[in-house]
């Protein structure tokens, strides 16, 4: 017997029982995006490796440790995308979408990072990202956060997420803070773990994000990023906070929030939750006004965020069990008798024409009425339409409400109208 081939560790299959809830959640997210006037962009899964090195930063964990990189047959270095922003910016530059233009874009799809698989974090994971180009005021930062808050309300998880905000200032202000932070860390080098010692010179702001309790205790005495902000960044952040307060969105200022990618400036934010065990990030983003120019385009203000769908699905299932997947089937067509199958299939096609958007499944494979009604229950159908030999001969069908058990014989020409009434 041939050996079974299994999925790669950390890259999961999502079976029909799982994809139904994903589809409902994704539908909710897309409806909200449409209500704000955002447009979908579809991007390649594979990009040239230098794109991510230039965008994310060569000394980030993502580039150093986590990317799936390989050479193709031409000897070019290619990478499975670890995030979506860099590819979105690349596409915007390549197709002339950005310079002197305003764009509100979103994308959804798989990303890849070679991390240790754990609950809600996998090597292939799915992200929905949102990117806005050409707008530089705090009002668009606020709109993105308000959009995400609308998602949480629609999904019934608003009470289980908390917004954390920070401003990391301009590139110049951050460089000044970096120097002060490195000087402080050098004085306390013996208290740092090996990872923080390495980051101290390559990417010192990432030390602020250390999960080591001893390092976090040390950082209580470190210089504060807020003390090094330029005046323009202070005003931008104050404007954002005021807009969020006006919108009734509570937030916490977290001066150690810096984000893991090098391209951010000014606003950074995260929505976090404690409802999945240890605190986890549900959605995160910020402003990256220098990235378009860094990747070869003209200077263009930009802001965006990304959200991991695996973690979002887990959170919705954990805190809002009433948020159910839509049924796979609304109507199940039961047919029994030697000459009924072709008539049943013809009726099913007529009903699909007349009841657009209704999900109708026709029984195939035979079976008595009892077995066919059991299949209707399995698929979650609300209504069964029954055709036997006598119904075919009389031009009728029996319509049965599977919730109440009531059934009615109806002329086949009137079945669609009767079903509309039953299904609401």
Swiss-Prot record:
Q: Catalyzes what? A: tRNA(His) + L-histidine + ATP = L-histidyl-tRNA(His) + AMP + diphosphate + H(+)
Respond yes or no to whether keyword RNA-binding is given for this record.
no
Q: What is its EC number?
A: 6.1.1.21
User: Which top-level group of life is the source organism from?
Assistant: Bacteria
User: Which keywords annotate this record?
Assistant: Aminoacyl-tRNA synthetase, ATP-binding, Cytoplasm, Ligase, Nucleotide-binding, Protein biosynthesis
Which CDD domains does this one have?
A: HisRS-like_core (cd00773), HisRS_anticodon (cd00859)
Pfam families per the UniProt record, alphabetical: HGTP_anticodon, tRNA-synt_His
Where in the cell?
Cytoplasm
Coarse class of the protein's main subcellular location? cytoplasm
GO biological-process terms attached to the record: histidyl-tRNA aminoacylation
Is Aminoacyl-tRNA synthetase among the key words of this record?
A: yes
Question: What cellular component terms from Gene Ontology apply here?
Answer: cytoplasm
Q: Which GO terms describe its molecular function?
A: ATP binding; histidine-tRNA ligase activity
Return the broad EC class: ligase
Subunit comment: Homodimer.
Family of this protein: Belongs to the class-II aminoacyl-tRNA synthetase family.
Q: Which NCBIfam families match?
A: hisS (TIGR00442)
Write down what this protein is called.
Histidine--tRNA ligase
